């Protein structure tokens, strides 16, 4: 990947710019940046970087927020805390540091099945709830919320696929497919066993009729899910998704986060190609200025979601969470 010298340049640049980041959340805030710095400190065995990471994360923990969401709110910070504790990056007691906030999050989402508008914008909280459930198995409310969100997503997607062929269909099909991709990723992440088989059948039928294009990402997660659950009958669809989806990749127009997200998927794809080598070359860039130019415009360029913190974490730990 990249040299230790370039990693340290990234650390200095991110640390310098982190002070101007106002959010405390995971995607665009200080907790996401601290996560990358903690991983880097472990990789380089550098206590100075660890101190920077700890300071940033402390700021995230003490800052008051009414946002309970995963991307930029309280549950994203909770996810980072659990990750740091379970991976022994810090020595801390979750209940002492985050017990009150955790209870507030659970109460906020306990009746999410009665708020469908909130459900479609809050589904990523499952990432937090899943790791929380492994930490606190005695709280039945946690799994209940996970189940309600999955069922809500499945109902929404089933209705969209049912109307897909209607000439008066007005919703954005790109958005619906993005939601389905996010749903598959969540099912795979949680090893969720009660996912809707009929929803998968509806998707496969639409694909077989030529109404949905191939997608490497959807093919990858479909393959992972059916393999884990010993399902049969989807091999042709998955093979075509991966084969043709890979052909649709154009490394020249991909942003930094897209290249990072594709690496693990491409490595597991059946067919290797020159495009993969191009992406790997881009992610091995030693020039900080060129790396910065790969970040999406109009985003928090040092952040975890799209920016340099994601890249730094990825470079220092191949198992860095890409959520």
Where are these regions (language model features)?
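Extended ligand-binding groove/face enriched in aromatic
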Residues: 51, 55-152
